[in-house]
Amino acid sequence: MEVEAAEARSPAPGYKRSGRRYKCLSCTKTFPNAPRAARHAATHGPADCSEEVAEVKPKPETEAKAEEASGDKVAGSAAKPRPYACPLCPKAYKTAPELRSHGRSHTGEKPFPCPECGRRFMQPVCLRVHLASHAGELPFRCAHCPKAYGALSKLKIHQRGHTGERPYACADCGKSFADPSVFRKHRRTHAGLRPYSCERCGKAYAELKDLRNHERSHTGERPFLCSECGKSFSRSSSLTCHQRIHAAQKPYRCPACGKGFTQLSSYQSHERTHSGEKPFLCPRCGRMFSDPSSFRRHQRAHEGVKPYHCEKCGKDFRQPADLAMHRRVHTGDRPFKCLQCDKTFVASWDLKRHALVHSGQRPFRCEECGRAFAERASLTKHSRVHSGERPFHCNACGKSFVVSSSLRKHERTHRSSEAAGAPPAQELVVGLALPVGVAGEGSATPAAGAGLGDPPAGLLGLPPESGGVMATQWQVVGMTVEHVECQDAGVREAPGPLEGAGEVGGEEADEKPPQFVCRECKETSSTMTLLRRHERSHPELRPFPCTQCGKSFSDRAGLRKHSRTHSSVRPYTCPHCPKAFLSASDLRKHERTHPVPMGTPTPLEPLAALLGIPEEGPA
């Protein structure tokens, strides 16, 4: 919508005398001030272009009076030619200044800054309307939240966020909108008017400002800074939503459960949890989603598109948030700190998961065996032991696995064999220590392994005083794939090759090609454990030195763990005795030395189910 400002010597009937007048170029109505002109501009239908204001030379007083007397302002305006056509959209204008003013809506140029807050505007009349907000001229106040507006039309658009009203429906796709300007922008997408494309990922936009916002997701630029907490954002709208958290403002409240939200989109997604509505359908797999962001993220998984690129290491990501989190690995930024042990984390959910270690909470309990877990994902993996579900399948050989990490380890055997030009050698289960009498029938069990020693009784879930063969002697099991069969699912499986395969497995294990390559000298190792042991000889791969003793580490986590040896901090306390430990893994090892009540699930139970070992009590 375009509104022109004109000089007038006499006011229109019913208005105060004013030196400037504002005229609508769609219907040629005139107004005595900018706010009234802007309110009127919003009343025109969605077919008009986005709100623009052009300042032109004033008409003579006689011509203005003649037009008012004739009452034929609309016809007179429509009869004039519009020789200045926009090359980016179908609009045309009578004068070159009007076209230049309109062109700012495509380029995103905002040459008129607010002297109070620095906000910039495309047109001077929009700046004048904005300045009224600094002067306190906000007569239109929302009844549902503290927001106020200088124009009634803006208040009506805002109130639709509370009521859920979306009167502007797209005839092509059915999508509806509350704001007519957003609806007009959406209509351009159907017209194919997306002249601004991203050079990195090819995504196209109808407006230059939208492209600029998108480009920040690639560059990581976040120019909008919160004055309260220092957090930065790539969009001003994101900063506005964030600032509501500090102000404790949640203007969007669910009528069903009373929960409040800072953003309209979050409120709308929440509403679907009550209705069960999932309007976003994936055409490839039929999966449905309740919010568009989850749907877009799911689609990228099908397409394999990872448009967000890390400049330092070359890694690609599907989401800008994932890239932002990954960048903390390079910068060392770990903003989430545990208040009990001073450990820091890259992501908030890592801190929440870590906090369960101190609290001892395990809210997710297995209904089959009673074992409890700190995370729902761990319970889901554990439940597959009971159900026999193995949802992760190898595309090369058809083998199935309980967890995705096991599938990834298995797939490496195919890749290494293809690189060596030979079929994969027969896999072995080697070096797996099991007590005598537990290996099951039909398994080839050689003599007891020398030097293994007696296992701690707690590792097998047995009290020290309980005798029997299960707590006295261990053997090394070396059996080929045909000996490993799950009795529940009937799927044969073996873990990847372990250390010592050449000693027990015979000649076939020697034929297996190396899998892991040193980053520094390209020397190959058959296992990741051997590779890590070898890489310790390269000081270049251990860039994190201890300032107290000079010992260096390959990662920051190893340095933090080592630093505790110089201090008295031992954050992990045993719930059964007063002992404390430097790490959670040391605590778990120690807990196994305590007697375990009969029938308590132990870490060996999933392994026993995998190998088809019958569940028996201690002898």
Curated annotation (Swiss-Prot):
Placement of covalent cross-link Glycyl lysine isopeptide (Lys-Gly) (interchain with G-Cter in SUMO2): K57, K59, K65, K80, K154, K512
Annotated localization: Nucleus
Listed Basic and acidic residues bias regions: 54-71
Zinc finger motifs (C2H2-type), residue ranges: 22-44, 84-106, 112-134, 140-162, 168-190, 196-218, 224-246, 252-274, 280-302, 308-330, 336-358, 364-386, 392-414, 516-538, 544-566, 572-594
Disulphide-bonded residues: none
Cited InterPro entries: Znf_C2H2_sf, Znf_C2H2_type
Gene: ZNF668
Residues annotated with N-acetylmethionine modification: M1
Sites bearing Phosphoserine, chain numbering: S10, S387
Keywords, in A-Z order: Acetylation, DNA-binding, Isopeptide bond, Metal-binding, Nucleus, Phosphoprotein, Repeat, Transcription, Transcription regulation, Ubl conjugation, Zinc, Zinc-finger
Protein name, entry field: Zinc finger protein 668
Role, per record: May be involved in transcriptional regulation. May play a role in DNA repair process.
GO biological process: DNA repair
Highest taxon of the lineage: Eukaryota
GO molecular function list: DNA-binding transcription factor activity, RNA polymerase II-specific; RNA polymerase II cis-regulatory region sequence-specific DNA binding; zinc ion binding
GO cellular component term, pick one: nucleus
Region entry Disordered, spans: 34-79, 492-513
